[in-house]
C-alpha cells in the first residue's frame, strides 16, 4: 500500500511538472528575445514620479520642496492626465479647493484644459522639478540589494534609464507596481463599468448605456458654454490587458459618438476593480487624504515604491473618493513628503541593473532601438547594462500600421479592406494627423481624387454642419470617419501606443516594439507600415536616413496650435521642432502654453512640415519634379507648388527661385521602400526624397492617397507571401486606377530618365537667358559639366560668361572663379532675405548672395578678398541671407585668414546671445501669436556665422563657445547641428 501511495504521489508530481512545463512553454512561445545592451541614463534623482496626474504633480512639488531632486515622466503630451484625459474638469457640489495649487487649477469650474495644463507646468517649473512628456515606463531598475532603483522609460527619443532612490507610481493602473512584481487582485472576465464624457451633440441611448447631463457648462474661449454628457457604460472585458482596454475604448466610442459633438474624453474612466495588495489594507470608507494610513499605498514586500492612485489597497468606494482631484492632490503632497524623507535616509543605489530573463523565442530576431540618450552634453551618458532578456508578444497580425495620421489611417483602412488582419497604433487619441489633431483642417493643394475624394464625401455624409471660425472641415467628423471605416473593415485600433523600436532578423523587419501605458512589448507582423511621419521604425531598424546635421539647419517651419472648442482651421508656424527629440518637444509644449495661455486648450500634435526621411530605393530630387519625370511604378500623383516654409539648399534653387505655379508630380513606389530593408513601407513626411522636393509631395490629399496605396501594397505582400519589392506593381496600379487615385496612363509609363544628351546640350545653350532650362542642365551633371566648361570658355559676352561661371561655381567647379570674384567685388549689397516661414515662396538668397556662395564653392584663392570686404559691411541689421551666404562661402574655403573678420562680425552688437539654454528663456523670449520669425532669424544668423568661424580655425575660441551654447539649446535642430559640427572637427 505504501508503495502504491508513493507511485501515486510521484505520478501526480510528474503530471504537475508537465503541466507547469507546458504553461511555461506556452508563456515562452509568447515572447521574443532582445540582446544584451547598455541603456543611457537620462536622470539621476532622489525621487522619480511616473505619471502626469494632478496627484503626481503635487507629489513631485512637495518632494522637491522637502529638498529632494525629482524627475516626473508624464505619459501624455501634457500634465493633468486625470482631469483632461477623461474630461473630468469640474468639481462636485461641496468640493472646495484649499491649497494654492488647487485654487489655481479651479479658478473656474469646469476648468479649461489650458488652465489645468499650464498651471501644472508652472508648479513643476517653480519647484525646480524636471519633467518630460510622452514617456512610458517600460521596466523597473533594481540594485544589488534587490531594492527598486528607478525606471526605464520609452519615448520618441528611444529608451533611457532614470536612477532613483524612491519611485512614485502615479499611473492610472499602477503599471510600475505591476512591473515591479506587486500582487494585485483579479480583473474578472465580464461586464465592467466605465465613464465617458462627450461635449455637444445629442444624448445617445441603447443597451448598457446611461447618460446624464453635466450640471456645469464647458466653458469656451470667447463664446457661450457647451453642454456635456456623462455616459456610464457597461462593457464586457476579457481581462485587464491593454488589448482589452483598447477594445473597450472603441466600443464606448461606437455607443456615444454623435455628429454634433465638439470634443470628448480621450480615454475611459474606471475605478480599478483590481487593487494591489499593500502593506496594510483599508476596507471601510475613505477617511480623508490627511488621515489615511500611508501603508495602503506601499505594495507588500516591495520597498521604495508608492502607488498614488486608484489601485491602492483601499475599498473601491474609498478609491472613488480618492480619485477626485482635490483628494488626489492632498494625498500626492503627503506621499511626496514621505518619498523625500525616505530618500533622504537612503544611500544611492549601487550596481543598478535591469532584471529579466531570456525566453525560448517564438521567432528569431532582435530588438533594435535608439539608445543614444537625450542629454544636451557633449559627453557620452553613463549607461546601465542589461543582459539578454525576453520581450512579450502583445499581438500577431498581417499588417501593423504605426501612426494613425494622414497616411496611417488610410493605410489601415485599405489593408483591412483587402482582407489583411490589420492593427493601427496611434499615440494620440484621435485619427487623422495634421488635418484633425493638428487642426490644419483645409487642403492647400493636392490631388483631390480617389481615396481622398471618398474621405471628403464620407465627412459630408454626416449631414449639415455649423460654420466654424477659420473654415475647413469638422475635425471630429473626420476623426470619426477614419475610425468607423477601420472598424467596418475589421481593423483593430489601439490608442495611446508609441512605436519605440523594431523587431528585425537580418534585413527583414518582422514586427514593431511598442510602449503602452501598461508596458513594453512586440507586435509581430508580416508587413510594418511606418506612418510615424518621421520614419521612426525604419530608422531604428537600420534604414539610412537624412535630416538636419552638420551641413546646416535648413528645415521647414513648424507650429503647435491653440485650440478653441469647436473651431476650424488653425495653422501656425512659429518655431523649428525636432520630432525625434523629446526635450525639444517638451520645450515646444511648455512654450506654447505661454504663447496661447488664454485659449481653451492646446493642440497635442506638433505640426512639423519636415521630418526625418529614409534613403529609399529611389530618392526623389527637385530635378525629377521640375522635369516631370515619369516612372514605371508610380503609385501617387501629387499636386502642389514649392511652398517651402523656409530657405532652400539645392543648387537649382540657389540659382533660380522656385515659382508658385501648380505642379503635378509622379511619386514612385520605391520612395516608400527603405534601402536594404524588407518587410516595411514608409509613408508621409518620412519617404525618400530630397528636402527641397518635399514641399510638393507633402500635401494632405496626396499623403492620404499615398497611405491608401501603401495599405493595398502591404495586403498584396501578405496575400502573395512575397517581399515588399516583389509584388505585382501593375496589379497595384490597376487597383489605384480603378479607385481613381491614378490616371490610366501610369499603366504604360516608363522612366523618362536619363534625358537625351541633345536635350542637355540645348539647355546649356539657352541657360544664359535667366537660367532658362536650368532644371534640365542640373538633371544630369555628368553630361552637363563638360558642356558648361566649354560654354564658359566660348562665351562671347560678359553676361553669358558670368551665367556659366555662376552655375559652375555653385556646383563646386573652379572654372570661372575670376569672373565670379570680379562680379562680387564690383557689386554693392542688394536687398537680402530674412527667414520667412508662412507664405515663403521664391528665392531665399539675393543675386549677390548666390554669387558669393558660388564664388566660395570654387575654392579659389581669388575668392577670399572680395567676400571679406562684403563681411565688413554687415551688422545686426543685415538680412539673414547675406550672413548665410558669406558663412557658406567662407566655411567652404576654410581659410584661417577669414577667422578674424568673422569673429569681429560676431562681436558686433545684437549678433550673439540668442541660444535658448533654459526653459525660462524659451518661454519669455518667444513672442506671442501664431507666427514668429524674429527668434529664428537671430539664432540662424548667429549659428551659421559661428559655424563658419569654427571651420575657419576659430579666433580666440569665440566660434567654439557659441557652438557649445547651441549644443545645449532646447531647440533640437540647433542643438544637433552644433553638436555635429563640434564632433566632426574633433573626429578629424
Pin down the residues of each PLM region:
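Flavin (FAD/FMN)-binding glycine-rich loop and adjacent Rossmann-like elements that form
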Residues: 24-27, 32-33, 38, 82, ...
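Conserved N-terminal/central alpha/beta ligand/cofactor-binding core
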Residues: 42, 62, 68-69, 73-143, ...
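Bacterial N-terminal signal peptides that target proteins for export
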Residues: 1-9
Amino acid at each position: 500500500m505504501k508503495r502504491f501511495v508513493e507511485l501515486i504521489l510521484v505520478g501526480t508530481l510528474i503530471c504537475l511538472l508537465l503541466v507547469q512545463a507546458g504553461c511555461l512553454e506556452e508563456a515562452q512561445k509568447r515572447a521574443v528575445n532582445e540582446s544584451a545592451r547598455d541603456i543611457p541614463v537620462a536622470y539621476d534623482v532622489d525621487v522619480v514620479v511616473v505619471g502626469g496626474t494632478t496627484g503626481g504633480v503635487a507629489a513631485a512639488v512637495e518632494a522637491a520642496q522637502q529638498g529632494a531632486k525629482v524627475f516626473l515622466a508624464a505619459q501624455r503630451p501634457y500634465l493633468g492626465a486625470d482631469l483632461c484625459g477623461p474630461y473630468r474638469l469640474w468639481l462636485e457640489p461641496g468640493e472646495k479647493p484649499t491649497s494654492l495649487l488647487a485654487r489655481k487649477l479651479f479658478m473656474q469650474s469646469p476648468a479649461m484644459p489650458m488652465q489645468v495644463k499650464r498651471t501644472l507646468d508652472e508648479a513643476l517649473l517653480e519647484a525646480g522639478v524636471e519633467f518630460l512628456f510622452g514617456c512610458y515606463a517600460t521596466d523597473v531598475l533594481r540594485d544589488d540589494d534587490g531594492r527598486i532603483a528607478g525606471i526605464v522609460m520609452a519615448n520618441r527619443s528611444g529608451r533611457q534609464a532614470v536612477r532613483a532612490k524612491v519611485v512614485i507610481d502615479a499611473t492610472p493602473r499602477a503599471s510600475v507596481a505591476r512591473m515591479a512584481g506587486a500582487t494585485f487582485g483579479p480583473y474578472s472576465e465580464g461586464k465592467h463599468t466605465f465613464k465617458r464624457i462627450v461635449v455637444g451633440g445629442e444624448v445617445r441611448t441603447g443597451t448598457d448605456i446611461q447618460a446624464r447631463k453635466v450640471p456645469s457648462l464647458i466653458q469656451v474661449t470667447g463664446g457661450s458654454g457647451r453642454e456635456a454628457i456623462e455616459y456610464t457604460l457597461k462593457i464586457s472585458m476579457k481581462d485587464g490587458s491593454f488589448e482589452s482596454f483598447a477594445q473597450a475604448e472603441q466600443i464606448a466610442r461606437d455607443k456615444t459618438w454623435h455628429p454634433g459633438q465638439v470634443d470628448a474624453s480621450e480615454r475611459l474612466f474606471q475605478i480599478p476593480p483590481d487593487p494591489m495588495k499593500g502593506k496594510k489594507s483599508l476596507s471601510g470608507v475613505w477617511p480623508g487624504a490627511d488621515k489615511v494610513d500611508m501603508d495602503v499605498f506601499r505594495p507588500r514586500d516591495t520597498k521604495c515604491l508608492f502607488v498614488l492612485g486608484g489601485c491602492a489597497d483601499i475599498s473601491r468606494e474609498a478609491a472613488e473618493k480618492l480619485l477626485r482631484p482635490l483628494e488626489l492632490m492632498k494625498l500626492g503632497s503627503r506621499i511626496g513628503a514621505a518619498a523625500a524623507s525616505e530618500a533622504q535616509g537612503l544611500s544611492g543605489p549601487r550596481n543598478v541593473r535591469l532584471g529579466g530573463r531570456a525566453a525560448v523565442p517564438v521567432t528569431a530576431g532582435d530588438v533594435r532601438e535608439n539608445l543614444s540618450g537625450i542629454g544636451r552634453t557633449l559627453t557620452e551618458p553613463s549607461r546601465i547594462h542589461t543582459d539578454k532578456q525576453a520581450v512579450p508578444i502583445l499581438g500577431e497580425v498581417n499588417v501593423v500600421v504605426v501612426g494613425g495620421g494622414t497616411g496611417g489611417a488610410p493605410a489601415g483602412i485599405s489593408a483591412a479592406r483587402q482582407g489583411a488582419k490589420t492593427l493601427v497604433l496611434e499615440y494620440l487619441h484621435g485619427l487623422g494627423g495634421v488635418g484633425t489633431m493638428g487642426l490644419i483642417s483645409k487642403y492647400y493643394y493636392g490631388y483631390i481624387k480617389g481615396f481622398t475624394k471618398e474621405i471628403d464625401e464620407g465627412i459630408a455624409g454626416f449631414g449639415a454642419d455649423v460654420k466654424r471660425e477659420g473654415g475647413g472641415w469638422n475635425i471630429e467628423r473626420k476623426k470619426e470617419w477614419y475610425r468607423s471605416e477601420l472598424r467596418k473593415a475589421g481593423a483593430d485600433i489601439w490608442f495611446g501606443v508609441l512605436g519605440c523600436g523594431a523587431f528585425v532578423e537580418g534585413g527583414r523587419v518582422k514586427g514593431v516594439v511598442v510602449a503602452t501605458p501598461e508596458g513594453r512589448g512586440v507586435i509581430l507582423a508580416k508587413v510594418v507600415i511606418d506612418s510615424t511621419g518621421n520614419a521612426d521604425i525604419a530608422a531604428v531598424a537600420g534604414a539610412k536616413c537624412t535630416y538636419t546635421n552638420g551641413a546646416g539647419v535648413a528645415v521647414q517651419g513648424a507650429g503647435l496650435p491653440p485650440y478653441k472648442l469647436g473651431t476650424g482651421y488653425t495653422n501656425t508656424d512659429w518655431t523649428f521642432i525636432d520630432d525625434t527629440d523629446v526635450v525639444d518637444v517638451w520645450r515646444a509644449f511648455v512654450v506654447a502654453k505661454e504663447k496661447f495661455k488664454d485659449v481653451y486648450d492646446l493642440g497635442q500634435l506638433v505640426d512639423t512640415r519636415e521630418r526625418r526621411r529614409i534613403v529609399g530605393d529611389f530618392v526623389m530630387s527637385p530635378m525629377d519634379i521640375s522635369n516631370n519625370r515619369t516612372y514605371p511604378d508610380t503609385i501617387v500623383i501629387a499636386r502642389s507648388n514649392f511652398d517651402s516654409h523656409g530657405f532652400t539648399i539645392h543648387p537649382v534653387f540657389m540659382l533660380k527661385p522656385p515659382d508658385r505655379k501648380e505642379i503635378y508630380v509622379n511619386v514612385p513606389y520605391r520612395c516608400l521602400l527603405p534601402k536594404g530593408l524588407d518587410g516595411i513601407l514608409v509613408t508621409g513626411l518620412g519617404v525618400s526624397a530630397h528636402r527641397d522636393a518635399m514641399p510638393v509631395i507633402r500635401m494632405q490629399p496626396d499623403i492620404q492617397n499615398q497611405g491608401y496605396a501603401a495599405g493595398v501594397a502591404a495586403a498584396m505582400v501578405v496575400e502573395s507571401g512575397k517581399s515588399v519589392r516583389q509584388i505585382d506593381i501593375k496589379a497595384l496600379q490597376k487597383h489605384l486606377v480603378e479607385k481613381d487615385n491614378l490616371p490610366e496612363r501610369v499603366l504604360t509609363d516608363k522612366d523618362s530618365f536619363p534625358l537625351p544628351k541633345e536635350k542637355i546640350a540645348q539647355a546649356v545653350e539657352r541657360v544664359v537667358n535667366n537660367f532658362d532650362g536650368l532644371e534640365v542642365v542640373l538633371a544630369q551633371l555628368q553630361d552637363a559639366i563638360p558642356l558648361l566648361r566649354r560654354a564658359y570658355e566660348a562665351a562671347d559676352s560678359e553676361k553669358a560668361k558670368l551665367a556659366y561661371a555662376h552655375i559652375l561655381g555653385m556646383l563646386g567647379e573652379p572654372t570661372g572663379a575670376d569672373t565670379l570674384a570680379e562680379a562680387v567685388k564690383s557689386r554693392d549689397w542688394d536687398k537680402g532675405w530674412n527667414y520667412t516661414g508662412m507664405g515663403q515662396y521664391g528665392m531665399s538668397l539675393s543675386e549677390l548672395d548666390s554669387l558669393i556662395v558660388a564664388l566660395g564653392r570654387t575654392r579659389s584663392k581669388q575668392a577670399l578678398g572680395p567676400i571679406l570686404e562684403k563681411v565688413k559691411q554687415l551688422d545686426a541689421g543685415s538680412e539673414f541671407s547675406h550672413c548665410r551666404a558669406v558663412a557658406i562661402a567662407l566655411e567652404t574655403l576654410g581659410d584661417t585668414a577669414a577667422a578674424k573678420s568673422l569673429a569681429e562680425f560676431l562681436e558686433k552688437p545684437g549678433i550673439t546671445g540668442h541660444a535658448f539654454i533654459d526653459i525660462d528663456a524659451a518661454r519669455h523670449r518667444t513672442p506671442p501669436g501664431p507666427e514668429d520669425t524674429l527668434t529664428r532669424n537671430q539664432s540662424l544668423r548667429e549659428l551659421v556665422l559661428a559655424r563658419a568661424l569654427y571651420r575657419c580655425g576659430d579666433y580666440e575660441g569665440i566660434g567654439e563657445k557659441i557652438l557649445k551654447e547651441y549644443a545645449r539649446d532646447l531647440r533640437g535642430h540647433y542643438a544637433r547641428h552644433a553638436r555635429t559640427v563640434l564632433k566632426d572637427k574633433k573626429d578629424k
